[in-house]
């Protein structure tokens, strides 16, 4: 951990995602109720460095860097930074942390993302705390869309990723051996065709 680490910081985390990793910082008690802290747009997890030491330390606080922010990996080129993508990031992070229920502390844009997550996965959120967050209102059809289609899309992607077998990595020697074996077996299955046995088709 760096010498200028935030007061009370107990660990810095790196959580694997398909495009790299999500960076996060943790404070408080590992046995305490979990709280996920979400920073504002173009900010990072360090925006909570001075606030969290002032909060009750019998909670477990994790402040994450959204993708493309702070120490987290940027998205792949050409992938846009949509609000719904950040909602999906939260679902990935809490799955990696093995949290079934937790509270959200969101600042500004982070509060909007946290609110959208709460609307999409209401059974997972214990409390939603918003700091300087713009008011956002959802029509009933938008709410239904979040609870059905967008939620289903997030869960489907995560299920597909979880069911995939890990990629196999071969050494150069293994690759050459596999190629040699394939060429040998294909050569043995070749049949010699007598010359003159093939004639052009007449029109």
From Swiss-Prot:
Family: Belongs to the AB hydrolase superfamily.
Organism of this sequence: Homo sapiens
UniProt-listed InterPro entries: AB_hydrolase_1, AB_hydrolase_fold, AB_hydrolase_sf
Protein name: Serine hydrolase-like protein
EC number: 3.1.-.-
Protein keywords: Hydrolase
GO MF annotation list: hydrolase activity
Top-level lineage group: Eukaryota
Role description: Putative serine hydrolase.
Keyword tRNA-binding attributed: no
């Amino acid at each position: 951990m760096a010498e200028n680490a935030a007061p009370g910081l107990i660990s810095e985390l790196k959580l694997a995602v398909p495009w790299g990793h999500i960076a996060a910082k943790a404070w408080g008690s590992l046995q305490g109720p979990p709280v996920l802290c979400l920073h504002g747009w173009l900010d990072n997890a360090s925006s909570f460095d001075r606030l969290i030491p002032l909060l009750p330390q019998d909670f477990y606080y994790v402040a994450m860097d959204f993708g493309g922010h702070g120490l987290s990996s940027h998205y792949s080129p050409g992938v846009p930074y949509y609000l719904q993508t950040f909602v999906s990031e939260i679902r990935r992070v809490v799955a990696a942390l093995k949290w079934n229920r937790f509270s959200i502390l969101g600042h500004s844009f982070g509060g909007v993302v946290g609110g959208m997550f709460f609307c999409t996965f209401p059974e997972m959120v214990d409390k939603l705390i918003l700091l300087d967050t713009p008011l956002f209102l959802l029509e009933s059809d938008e709410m239904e869309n979040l609870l059905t289609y967008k939620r289903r899309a997030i869960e489907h992607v995560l299920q597909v990723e979880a069911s995939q077998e890990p990629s196999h990595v071969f050494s150069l020697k293994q690759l050459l051996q596999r190629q040699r074996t394939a060429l040998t077996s294909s050569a043995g299955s070749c049949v010699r065709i007598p010359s003159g046995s093939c004639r052009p088709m007449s029109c």
